[in-house]
Amino acid sequence: MDSILVTGNGPLNGQIPIAGAKNACLTLMPATLLSDEPLTLTNAPRLSDIKTMTLLLQSLGAEVSSLQDGKVLAMSSHDLTSHTADYDIVRKMRASNLVLGPMLARLGQAVVSLPGGCAIGARPMDLHIEALEALGAEIELRDGYLHAKAPGGLKGAVHEMRFASVGATENMVMAATLAKGTTVLKNAAREPEIVDLVRCLRAMGAQIEGEGTSTIEIQGVDRLHGATHQVVTDRIELGTYMLAPAICGGEVELLGGRLDLVGAFVEKLDAAGIDVAETDKGLKVSRRNGRVSAVNVTTEPFPGFPTDLQAQMMALLCTAEGTSVLEEKIFENRFMHAPELTRMGARIEVHGGTATVRGVERLKGAPVMATDLRASVSLILAGLAAEGETLVSRVYHLDRGYEHVVQKLEAVGARIERIKG
């Protein structure tokens, strides 16, 4: 099993290109199931999760071709041969559940295994089921699979979600594009990935309004056609690499970065003593003189502070001056990186959904273990500024969400290498 060796060194300087958004691409790919015409995605990230979604779509009979070194995905669902998403593929990645809505809308039936992915809490499917049932779907759980059918087709409805779930919003919006009549989704998630999905669906002929707000209205159409769509910049990769110069010092330009994707995160960086400036090519990040200042962080749905940057932010605050409090309100059990950071000398106390971080002057390198995708990169960031060597094991998580992480950090001066296991 591979590991990554990080040696603490000085400031980082240079440029890092930001890839297309993993979470957007994993939503856009199942949209091909809604049409019998080709869908092409450009600016696709090159990640293991994308390969998993490719295998899933191919198992349903879709054609998926990876072009231009994986940056372009050409897909066609002209001849679907199955409506069953098997456990062997779905167990590897939670986003597999996003084939449920599209298959139900186009085929009138779908059988989807309960999903897998990172071990960060229950993350139930209840909200997805409630949303699709509101459109007239009949869904039951048998033998670990969701069996869904809509023999008379889906019908538009007004539905208010109990929680602004990103995945449930995506599933319902895709399903509603082919439903009869008008669907109004209230308390919808507002994430940029949903805005990107709607832009793609609109290019395919869908009639949708309100993306980026808490109320989305979809007027169902008889069919969708093909389209070409550019995947939005990955705001989580962007935020992650913004933290590299914040932790190590120096000045790094993030190519393709956009402030509107990371607003609440940038506010916390500013409060901690980090400067972020827009450039012609993206965003430039540098740390003001001295140690960063402690800040309190509460994770919230967009446009609040993203849960997917909480672990990386904790790595920064481990060496802040003062005491920081991080409150996790999106997922349970998402402080599994805290004990590993403690092995490096961090002072962290976790009580339920709250972590208290008392800053120390410097962390010390140590062998640590990645427990999930974002935890793995937080340990790498911590190691960049730690004294000595940090060996991060179980980095297979990393390949699910970051392309060429070693090369990108090396390019700005980090001392980092991947060790094959």
UniProtKB/Swiss-Prot annotation:
Pathway recorded for this protein: Cell wall biogenesis; peptidoglycan biosynthesis
Signal peptide: none
Keyword Acetylation: no
InterPro entries for this protein: Enolpyruvate_Tfrase_dom, Enolpyruvate_Tfrase_sf, MurA_subfamily, RNA3'P_cycl/enolpyr_Trfase_a/b, UDP_GlcNAc_COvinyl_MurA
Coiled coil: none
Annotated residues for binding of phosphoenolpyruvate: K22, N23
GO MF entry, a single one: UDP-N-acetylglucosamine 1-carboxyvinyltransferase activity
Active-site residues from the entry: C118 (proton donor)
GO biological process per UniProt: cell division; cell wall organization; peptidoglycan biosynthetic process; regulation of cell shape; UDP-N-acetylgalactosamine biosynthetic process
Single GO cellular component term: cytoplasm
PANTHER family: UDP-N-ACETYLGLUCOSAMINE 1-CARBOXYVINYLTRANSFERASE
UniProt similarity note: Belongs to the EPSP synthase family. MurA subfamily.
Function summary: Cell wall formation. Adds enolpyruvyl to UDP-N-acetylglucosamine.
Name assigned to this protein: UDP-N-acetylglucosamine 1-carboxyvinyltransferase
Source organism (scientific name): Ruegeria pomeroyi (strain ATCC 700808 / DSM 15171 / DSS-3)
